[in-house]
Amino acid sequence: MEEPRELSATEIESLRCDLETLSRELTAQLEANADAARPVKLDQTAVGRISRVEAMQGQAMAQAGQRTAKLRLDQCRNALQAIERGGYGLCRKCEEPIGVKRLRAKPEAPFCLSCQHAVDQR
């Protein structure tokens, strides 16, 4: 297991680029999927109740995807702000370094693995 350490300036700059790219991708995803998450309209040309149920299931899945994308986008924005403030890479809960491997996999991660596990258990 990786021993968490503070990030170098080069690592921070690389992760900043990753965060900016991810931010653009999530924004585009939210815009592209906005229609799918809107309320289901009754389609008189569709066949029966099954079509409406399927449409509502599709809407629920789209809404869940939108919520996840919005959360990740907020985390990206918070991480970019943390870079500006000089606190990026530190766990928001215990204030220890998050770890380079974790940040490369999920650059918007606000917590170290231990604290994330504790948050997930709630």
Q: Where do the protein language model's features map onto the residues?
A:
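Interaction interfaces in information-processing and related assembly proteins
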Residues: 1-85
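Cysteine-rich micro-motifs
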Residues: 109-117
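Cys/His-rich microdomains that often coordinate metals
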Residues: 98, 119
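Residue-level signal for mature regions of secreted extracellular proteins and peptides
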Residues: 84-87, 105-108
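Residue-level signature of catalytic and energy-coupling elements of molecular machines
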Residues: 19, 94, 103
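Short, cysteine/histidine-rich loop/knuckle motifs that typically chelate Zn2+
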Residues: 93-94, 114
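Cys/His-enriched microdomains
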Residues: 89-92, 110
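Short Cys/His-rich "knuckle" micro-motifs
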Residues: 101-105, 122
